[in-house]
Design a protein with these regions (language model features):
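Surface-exposed, low-hydrophobicity beta-strand/loop segments enriched in small/polar/acidic residues
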Residues: 1-161
């Protein structure tokens, strides 16, 4: 996983007004991943288990972006191990954050320009919009080159769509 050189935290908005969620991580993930409730696992101590989003590209779903675990000294480039307690953030329009953007097609070398619109991809990442998606949740806020298939943390703004 590579990342934007200018930031070291997922949530960039200074006074976030979206919703913070907590849960338990099913399998290891990097911060910036879009998460979903693992419907096959009952809540543990009142907390749901979460996994990387598995929906088909472009489908509508709750946006819950995995945050870094700064309370134990982790950064947004540190993978979070499975079965750890996690925090996520559900952005509102205008919120700025870092999300994992992956290369589409061949898997390497994609570039994103400021203003590009992103859609959800399988595996909890986002890709440039294609076709007629149900939801286009983010707009790119920085130019990124050589986006990788495993995901590159990219500065985005939530669109609310």
């Amino acid at each position: 996983m590579t990342m934007s050189a200018s930031h070291n935290t997922i949530l960039l908005t200074s006074a976030p007004m979206g919703r913070f969620l907590e849960g338990i991580l099913n399998t290891a993930c990097y911060p910036g991943t879009n998460m979903e409730v693992d419907a096959a696992v009952e809540p543990i101590g009142g907390k749901h288990t979460w996994q990387a989003s598995s929906l088909t590209t472009g489908q509508r779903q709750l946006l819950a972006i995995l945050l870094e675990n700064e309370m134990v000294g982790k950064t947004c480039s540190d993978q979070i191990a499975d079965e750890q307690k996690i925090r996520m953030y559900c952005p509102i329009p205008g919120d700025e954050l870092l999300v994992l953007v992956s290369a589409s097609g061949t898997g390497t070398g994609d570039a994103q320009a400021i203003g590009d619109i992103l859609i959800r991809a399988s595996g909890g990442t986002f890709i440039a919009t294609t076709g007629t998606p149900e939801q286009e949740p983010f707009q790119v806020m920085e130019t990124m080159t050589d986006v990788t298939s495993t995901g590159t943390l990219t500065h985005v703004m939530a669109t609310g769509t």
